[in-house]
Regions:
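Terminal-proximal interaction/regulatory segments of ATP-powered molecular machines
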Residues: 1-96, 105-134
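Short beta-strand elements
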Residues: 101-103
């Protein structure tokens, strides 16, 4: 949880180390486990995901969940006979696979839960995101 988005590939690497340790058994298992520990201890750190999910859960617990925008609901008739899923913009049909569209309920449409951390990976992601939004 401390490494997070600063080095997201660490999840797969540590899992591979644990799987390898399970297959090897002791005493050899200590090597991949030590490698995983050193990798995590020396990796850059980020708590941006923890902060974001914490803020999102706080809103849910405060009753700020609202209803999904109708364009994101499945296309079918709802209980009132109105069609749902209308006017959905398929992001992959747009340049850079992105289109401006409301994804959160009206009450939360301007809330930003994820904030990029100050590390190489997240700075690059932020730059990419700003570039594709134009």
């Amino acid at each position: 949880e401390d490494v997070g988005m600063a080095y997201p590939q660490a999840i797969a690497i540590v899992k591979a180390c644990v799987d390898t340790a399970m297959q090897l058994g002791l005493p050899e298992a200590q090597l991949p486990l030590a490698q995983a520990a050193v990798l995590l201890a020396t990796a850059p750190k980020s708590n941006s995901v923890i902060e974001g999910i914490g803020a999102a859960w706080a809103d849910v617990k405060a009753g700020k969940s609202g209803n999904f925008p109708r364009c994101l609901q499945n296309v079918h008739a709802d209980s009132t006979g109105g069609a749902q899923g209308q006017n959905y913009k398929y992001p992959h049909a747009y340049p850079n696979h992105w289109v401006k569209q409301q994804y959160l309920p009206d009450e939360l449409k301007n809330v930003q839960y994820y904030r990029y951390g100050d590390n190489k990976v997240e700075r690059a992601a932020a730059q990419y995101w700003e570039a594709i939004k134009g």
